[in-house]
Amino acid sequence: MTIEYRQITIAERRRFSSAVEQGFGKHYTPTHDAFCLDNKLLSPDMTMCAFDDGEIVGTTGAYQFESAVPGGAIIKNAGITAVTVSATHRRRNILTNMMQRLLKQERDKGQVIASLWASESIIYGRFGYGVAIQHEAIKVDTTRAELKHMPAIPGRVRYVDIHEARQIFPAAWDAAVRYHVGIPKRSDDQWDRSMIESSSQSDWGQPWFVVYEEDGEPLGYAIYYLKELGIFAGQSSGLINADMVIYSNPASHAALWNHLL
């Protein structure tokens, strides 16, 4: 068996996406708009894949990001994504060969750092990655929860629809990029794809959007979903899925979580 390593071609773009989703146990069934955005966001020259007799058996890619580092400088950041190896080709050194080629490819483009959101973090230390932040899923009983400290809130939280969210959330995101280390800047196409994803979580229904503003300036926002479980003993019961909480100062952080709780 000879494995070929190379970038995909434009004609192989849908096969690439199907292979990526298959690697995560899903089927690739995008809308036309989502497929067009996928093509623009991750073009063939941003990929590095493994082929066995023409079949895609391994995938990697790298978004072209910019992120803040300690000290406030904004630097180029290769956002590693779509890392999969087919279950039929495991333990054949395919991931190592793809990752080495992809990192060299991105270094040659002038990318200063590489970052990723690891589904299996134990894998990536061998390639030079280190843990930058922990990810936790937290369940909160809102009937018993309150903020321990509530700073002064000079602004306000208000609801917006998806169209206004698309217009004003980027400003809040940019403020958060300057406030936090590591958050990548987003292009218009990335924002369009993000809003499509936010509106397509069918298990939770339609999203709710709120923005935190001070003097009309967006400084934070939240995207969340509600699921009503029923009425028990005269009281309604339900779940809130806080999908995204973006903030750029203590006031926006507290105000948004106070709203959610």
Functional labels for PLM-detected ranges:
Residues M1-R14, S18, K26-Y28, D52, ...:
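Intrinsically disordered, low-complexity, positively biased terminal segments
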Residues N77, V85-I113, W117-S119, R126, ...:
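Acyl-donor binding region in acyl/amide transferases
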Residues N39-L41, G71-G72, G130:
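Short glycine-biased active-site loop of nucleotidyltransferases that positions the nucleotide triphosphate
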Residues I3-T9, R13-A19, G23-H27, A34, ...:
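Ligand-binding pocket scaffold of soluble enzyme catalytic domains
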Residues N39-G58, G79, Q134, M195-V210:
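A short helix-loop-beta-strand connector motif used in the catalytic cores of GNAT acetyltransferases and
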Residues P44-M46, F51-A73, T81, Y224-G230:
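Acetyl-CoA-dependent GNAT
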Residues W117, G130-L147:
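Conserved catalytic-core motifs of GNAT/GCN5-like acyltransferases
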